From Swiss-Prot:
HAMAP family: Nudix_RppH
Annotated protein name in UniProt: RNA pyrophosphohydrolase
Entry's EC annotation: 3.6.1.-
Molecular function, one GO term: guanosine-3',5'-bis(diphosphate) 3'-diphosphatase activity
Gene name per UniProt: rppH
PROSITE patterns named in the record: NUDIX (PS51462), NUDIX_BOX (PS00893)
Residue numbers covered by motif Nudix box: 44-65
Keyword Hydrolase applies: yes
InterPro entries: Nudix_hydrolase, NUDIX_hydrolase-like_dom_sf, NUDIX_hydrolase_CS, NUDIX_hydrolase_dom, RppH
Family to which the UniProt record says this protein belongs: Belongs to the Nudix hydrolase family. RppH subfamily.
Pfam family of the protein (one): NUDIX
SUPFAM superfamilies: Nudix
Names of the cofactor(s): a divalent metal cation
Biological processes per GO annotation: nucleoside phosphate metabolic process; ribose phosphate metabolic process
């Protein structure tokens, strides 16, 4: 990381590992992904004064259309997970205010049907398509600078999935 960015803070964020009854995990392909390589789990910023669980349910609803009554919170990550953006993205995302994200992750069990997932629930949409994948596939689907975090989250939640 460029030393000029080292003093920037991390953006507070929540991530959601949404699992179905078969133990597969929801991933969405980012709508701004032109190369088909940016699949990720729902995640997003925590608003000022917002608590973690409501933030997770809000992000889940905005990005997937899944209503809170269709999920059960199973676990919360023990610690925050940090990642740094590549230098070329720091000035482009979040108004250049952050060097990356500090994320708390929640594991949620999905009790709905696939038809309850609606990527058009929020405008603008976050994802262009979605699928269920095996947890071990997650690190290979995400952009490289987030892979370490995805490995940590899979390792932490593996026995609960």
């Amino acid at each position: 990381m460029n030393d000029a960015f080292a003093g920037l803070p991390y953006r507070p964020c929540v991530g959601v590992m949404l699992v179905n009854s078969q133990g597969r995990v929801f991933v969405g392909r980012r709508i701004d992904d032109k190369d088909g390589v940016a699949w990720q789990m729902p995640q997003g910023g925590i608003d000022d004064g917002e608590e973690l669980h409501p933030a997770a349910l809000r992000e889940l609803s905005e990005e997937t259309g899944v209503a809170a009554e269709l999920v059960t919170i199973i676990a919360e990550s023990r610690e925050e997970h940090l990642y740094d953006l590549p230098d070329e993205l720091i000035g482009k995302l979040w108004g250049g205010q952050y060097r990356g994200q500090r994320q708390k992750w929640l594991l949620l069990r999905f009790a709905g049907e696939d038809t309850d997932i609606r990527l058009d629930a929020h405008d603008p949409a976050e994802f262009s398509e979605w699928r269920w994948v095996e947890p071990e596939q997650l690190p290979d689907l995400i952009v490289p600078f987030k892979r370490r975090v995805y490995r940590q989250v899979v390792d932490e939640f593996r026995d609960l999935i």
